[in-house]
Amino acid sequence: MTSAPPRWTTAELAEDAATSAAQFRTERLAVTDSWGTHYNQARGKFELLFKKLSDLNPEAITDDNLAEAYGLGLGEALRYLAGPPISDDDLQVIADVESIAPGVLKKNAEALRKVFGVIERVIDPHRFPWMETGGMPTEQQREAALLASSVLLAAQRIATERRNEGKDNQETMVKDYLRTLGFTEAPAAAINTIVKGPQAMQFCAECQLGERKADVVVRLHDTRLMAIECKVSNSSTNSVKRLNNDAAVKAEYWIKQFGTAQVVPSRSLVSSRY
């Protein structure tokens, strides 16, 4: 006889949320060298970029040293010269080039100039005031620009790292729990019909379920598929947004695509704060 799934009371959810919040505070306040590592890596990138582009002296920036900078993997640092920084996708669309891959830009001077032309138009005047007037920066301007740019890139890097770590940790906890129930992991595969994907007592991670990706897909004992979303947020407002705008939207799509009797959308609250 199948038992009914548990239904948590508001008080129980509030207690779990408080426990998770306490764990979150402990993790964030723990001593770590992550920030220093990201800052030093970013600083190294910008110092090398300044060296290759003659301290961003507009008159000294040539196709050759731009190509060399991209070849050295400094494309990200170049994007962060913009105020605000510009994404890979946006830069490619605005520059109207087929690719901004370093290997491509190194061999295509026209595309390279179009890409840097976009960056020049949106260069941050607060960090790089000398680029508007031409010439070299003062030592104070140079140091301020290096510091601000390194902090900007490092902050983005560590924010991305924290999001990925939280999601990965949550997925790991879900998969470990499934293993304790006797499930085994199967290779990820595109699931376009209800019979595809993991089979009896199996699950897969990062599977394409229809046209939407699911974090974990489980083949239940009754042959239905359970799609589990593992999303991490550290504020109640963002958690509600993620539930409504991400997990709920996917759930609606999967039910419409596969039917209410065939798929069980769910949301993991294992390690999120709320």
From Swiss-Prot:
Record-listed E.C. numbers: 3.1.21.4
Annotated organism of origin: Xanthomonas campestris pv. amaranthicola
Name of the protein in its database record: Type II restriction enzyme XamI
Entries under InterPro entries matching the protein: Restrct_endonuc_II_XamI
Catalytic activity: Endonucleolytic cleavage of DNA to give specific double-stranded fragments with terminal 5'-phosphates
Keywords: Endonuclease, Hydrolase, Nuclease, Restriction system
Gene designation: xamIR
One biological process term in Gene Ontology: DNA restriction-modification system
One Gene Ontology molecular-function label: DNA binding
